[in-house]
């Protein structure tokens, strides 16, 4: 969920949706909550937690959105499994994150700066490895890249 800088304004356009935001960082969650309060969002709830051990029932969500998270998650496989578990049959998993191998300069920066600060944690997906991983779980997968970022939309089988 992060600070909500990209999502909170979007959520204002979805007044009938029930939106649940989860982040491991209390600081990030606090910043997102402040943005939601300033926008008077009444349909958004916040919960601190670990994407690798989601505190929700199987099939609890119609849509799971993950923006710029997977390159930072410490246990990526657990995150993929948990997201699949909490997504209802026919639900949509979408998002974006850094993938290695698309931009040498970005790869260098990730290794020498972001990893050292703890913002990114290896191992990283490549576009090819992500496509294979998602196609094993989901009935339909669409993905593309913009420089070193991959975006994807996946549909879980009914």
Residue ranges: model-predicted function:
Residues 52-63:
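A short acidic, Gly/Pro-enriched loop at the edge of an enzyme's catalytic core
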